[in-house]
Design a protein with these regions (language model features):
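Membrane-interface loop-to-helix entry segments
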Residues: 34, 38, 42-45, 49-58, ...
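Selective recognition of specific alpha-helical transmembrane segments in multi-pass small-molecule
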Residues: 114-122, 202-217, 228-248, 281-284, ...
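Flexible loop linkers connecting adjacent transmembrane helices
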Residues: 48-72, 95, 101-102, 117-159, ...
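Alpha-helical membrane segments and immediately flanking helix-loop junctions
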Residues: 67-99, 125-128, 135-150, 163, ...
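Helix-loop-helix module between adjacent transmembrane segments
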Residues: 38-43, 114-139, 148-185, 189-213, ...
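Extracellular/periplasmic helix-exit of transmembrane alpha-helices
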Residues: 122-134, 240-256, 270, 300-301, ...
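N-terminal alpha-helical transmembrane segments of multi-pass membrane transport
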Residues: 1-87, 97-104, 115, 439-461
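Transmembrane helix-loop junctions in multi-pass membrane proteins
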Residues: 45-50, 89-93, 176-188, 211-223, ...
């Protein structure tokens, strides 16, 4: 019953809204239309911000925290990078290539480049409309909070809760439960391949260790400060080393990505829609731009200008997809296709790592995925704080209850089928994006006005 409901909503969001009469027919979903519209609108209105103001984005990350409360710019980037790098760059890229082929990688790049401007706008708004957090200290915010402000403006009075804000918060909690399932599903599969450990045993150990960390009130940020930089650098160094070792093969891989991206073969077979759809879906799941996840961390930063936090999160999108996602994609695509035929999920990635590094590769990717998964789980629970508070008020019982639900979803995910687990995450992130866009479209001018003011002040300095 529940699986059927998830699949029905999934088809509504990601199924074909209409068919373009090209080749065998190209299916375009509602979510692709929505993201494409935002991807065209926001970069043009920010005048290609990632290109023009890249140096400012770097400078914003390096700024020190302005006060004692809240997080630094670097800490918010670490939290958002934890969820992006954790599942998006490993499991997300694997899913895109498994379902959409090499061409899906190109559409992930496009989603990131267009999404950086979207991330700037949503994170700037989150910083502008943040609120004090009486439970954890510091600040909290995100789309639920600026959706609430928008609803109060339209109604002309103070509201206890807004329907659209509550729907976003609920969608976020659903999505993050889905991500919890993806975590345990992928880790248990990787450990079964690497160490022949039964999925149930891996899942129970993973859940127990996660419980020790997350049931402590303020352990999340401290844990991520240590874990994320170390593991991201290690993974990046090893994957770049593999790519450089296989440099002569890289032109052929790039040719395959671009050839399949534009459907020169796929359009004839009617498969271009699958390439585009999987690239966009996994790109959104990876970099989170427009979904409203990262603004939940952006709101918590101590920052003297909301625009700077927009810069930080826009940079995070580029780091995630253009740099690290590409490394994972190249790892798989540098392997001869006949060796990975018929493989999907972590089986595909581990086979690729075995090809490059021998038996050590299987162990390396299993351990790396486990560490990344912890960072992702901690990151999404940090995102959930403000949304749980919006729905249930400021109390510890609701915060603890959601953490327990997420831990239960870890257990369930380890036992579920690969596709069912991804469907729940896709449903949640799709709904989040829809409700977030309901605020971004009418409120984007506020972020753009702040950007113009920032650039005017910069010229006077």
């Amino acid at each position: 019953m529940l699986v059927n409901l998830i699949e029905s909503v999934y088809r509504l969001l990601w199924g074909d809204l209409f068919i373009l009469p090209l080749g065998g027919g190209i299916g375009i979903s509602f979510m692709v239309v929505l993201l494409l519209a935002a991807g065209i609108c926001f970069p043009s209105r920010t005048r290609l911000l990632p290109v023009r103001l890249f140096r400012d984005m770097i400078a914003a990350v390096c700024e020190k925290k302005q006060g004692r409360d809240g997080l630094s710019s670097l800490q918010t980037l670490i939290i958002s990078t934890a969820t992006r790098v954790g599942m998006g760059n490993l499991v997300g890229v694997v899913a895109a290539v498994s379902a959409g082929g090499a061409g899906a990688v190109f559409w992930m790049w496009v989603t990131a480049l267009l999404g950086a401007s979207t991330s700037f706008i949503e994170s700037t708004l989150a910083q502008k409309y943040r609120q004090p957090d009486p439970l954890y200290g510091g600040w909290r915010g995100g789309p639920a909070y600026y959706l609430h402000v928008l609803a109060e403006r339209k109604r002309g009075k103070k509201l206890k809760r807004s329907v659209t804000a509550a729907l976003f918060a609920a969608s976020g909690l659903i999505c993050w439960c889905g991500i919890s399932q993806v975590i345990s599903n992928s880790v248990s599969s990787a450990f079964e391949n690497a160490f022949h450990i039964p999925p149930l045993a891996t899942t129970l150990v993973l859940t127990a260790i996660a419980a020790v960390i997350v049931l402590r009130r303020n352990a999340t940020v401290k844990s991520l400060d240590v874990m994320v930089p170390i593991m991201a650098v290690c993974y990046f160094v090893i994957t770049v080393g593999i790519v450089l070792f296989n440099l002569p093969k890289l032109p052929a891989v790039l040719g395959r990505i671009f050839t399949e991206a534009f459907g020169l073969r796929q359009a004839v077979a009617g498969g271009f829609g699958a390439v585009l759809m999987n690239g966009v879906k996994r790109g959104l799941f990876s970099n989170e731009a427009g979904s409203g996840s990262a603004p939940c961390a952006a709101a918590a930063a101590e920052c003297d200008d909301p625009v700077k936090m927009g810069f930080v999160q826009a940079l995070g999108v580029l780091i995630d997809t253009v740099v690290i996602c590409s490394c994972t994609a190249f790892l798989m695509l540098l392997v001869p296709q006949e060796l990975t035929a018929g493989l999907a999920g972590m089986d595909l990635l581990q086979k690729a790592m075995q090809y490059h590094l021998g038996s050590f590769g299987i162990v390396f990717i299993a351990v790396t995925l486990a560490l990344f998964s912890f960072s992702t789980f901690l990151g999404v629970l940090y995102y959930a704080r403000g949304n749980v508070a919006y729905l249930c008020g400021d109390n510890w019982w609701s915060q603890t209850a959601y953490k327990l639900i997420a831990l239960v979803m870890l257990v369930i995910g380890g036992m579920q089928a690969y596709t069912v687990v991804w469907d729940l995450g896709d449903v949640g992130i799709g709904l989040m994006t829809i409700f977030n866009m309901l605020a971004l479209v009418p409120m984007a001018h506020e972020a753009l006005d702040a950007l113009n003011d920032y650039e005017k002040r910069k010229k006077l300095q």
